[in-house]
Amino acid sequence: MLHGRTVRSTIPRGEITKVRLGFNRDGFTVADWRDVPGRNTIALIELDQPCLAERDVRHFAEPILLLAHADRDRLLEAEVSIAYRPAEPVYDPERSPHCFKEIVIEKGNVARGLEGADLVVEGEYRVGHQEQLYIETNGVIAVPENGGVTVYGSLQCPYYVQRALTVLLALPPEKVRVVQAETGGGFGGKEEYPSMIAGHACLLALKSGRPVKIVYDRVEDMIATTKRHPGVIRHSTGVRRDGRLTAIEIDVLLDGGAYMTLSPVVLSKIGRAHV
């Protein structure tokens, strides 16, 4: 079995200009976006997120290159230098020109309800990223077999992973087997992200012809995987002196980051919860 490693961007936004391998490649398997047999994307709601960056970097720690070796120490010691042409990142969702999804839920006449209130209470609330901090970090084993691949992993949604791999690897569903191992916590953090780490392990496994294991340490898991969304929530609530509510207007803005992932699903759940 080989150990796998993901080489990631060190800038939040820019263009990759050069990748240099500073190690003896003997015994190594190296893969980049050109080794993807299917579509270089993580298939989910939209096909906007690459499995491996081709040229553009859109967030810090974006996957660029994959390495595998039988000796884990040699794997971790392998030096890779990447040159970039940096660009200005956008960190504030209120400044972003791009909207992944807008959901409107209307019931009754909100404007009239607020006008008929004795008092309108307004508030703005900001929440930051939340790390799920599951006990077991993300990890998978990919085994090439029978003209396809079997993946064993710590994950929540095996059918998400299977669909993503059929698109990435250009394989029929019956050639992609995903086994959900006993999972040491997820809390949403292993809902869609395992499609990424599974894709990386599979690319290395298919190129090397050997099983490949990738297990993140805590630092990599925290900096590279998706989190609970930061957001800005604004409430306007109309109330009367007798305590009755006349109307509530709620605006929720989520920071979905560089790619859509499952942000519309999260937004829809927040909307239903407030209603």
Annotate the PLM regions.
Residues 140-144, 163-177, 200-214, 241:
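Proline/glycine-anchored alpha-helix kink/cap motifs
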Residues 46-75, 188-241:
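Glycine-rich and small/hydrophobic secondary-structure elements
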Residues 110, 114-169, 254-256, 263-268:
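Conserved beta-alpha junction segments in alpha/beta enzyme cores
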Residues 26-39, 171-179, 211-215:
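Glycine-rich phosphate/pyrophosphate-binding loops
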Residues 151, 175-181, 209-219, 246-252:
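Beta-strand segments within the central parallel beta-sheet cores of soluble alpha/beta enzyme folds
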Residues 1-100, 120-123, 207, 262:
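Flexible, low-hydrophobicity surface segments
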Residues 74-90, 160-161, 166, 171, ...:
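Gly/Pro-rich active-site capping loops and adjacent beta-alpha segments
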